[in-house]
Amino acid sequence: MDIFFQSKKLEKIASDPRKCLKELGQTRAELFQKRLRDLYRADTLEDVRYLPGRYHELSENRKGQWACDLDQPYRLIFEPHEDPIPTDENGKYVWIEIKGV
């Protein structure tokens, strides 16, 4: 899956293990790197749906965003790169058609 970052700072944290460890601490950095690896290895968002980390859609004011757990209470929040986000006839998001975040 293609991953794009909202800021250069976040991209640097994701690509530099030492900076990631310094910014996030050991436990959160390990989980952050693992979740990113899961996303990189996936072809679509559906591939990570049932992996550890509880990947899930958000609602209310965060509708159109997804999250996965890091260490409590932290989570990684991301948005699909597709615009508009693919939906079915019932208005539910089609995870298998999302190929970038």
Where are each of the predicted segments found?
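A short, surface-exposed loop/turn module that caps and links secondary-structure elements
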Residues: 43-66
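Residue-level signal for secondary-structure boundary elements
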Residues: 18, 22, 44-48, 70
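Enriched for short, Lys/Arg-rich terminal
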Residues: 68-101
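Generic alpha-helix structural propensity
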Residues: 31-34, 53, 69
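Arg/Lys-rich, positively charged N-terminal/basic patches that mediate binding to nucleic acids
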Residues: 1-37
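Pocket-edge structural micro-motifs
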Residues: 7, 59, 70
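Short, surface-exposed charged micro-motifs
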Residues: 2, 57, 67, 77
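Short, contiguous, well-ordered secondary-structure segments
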Residues: 38-42
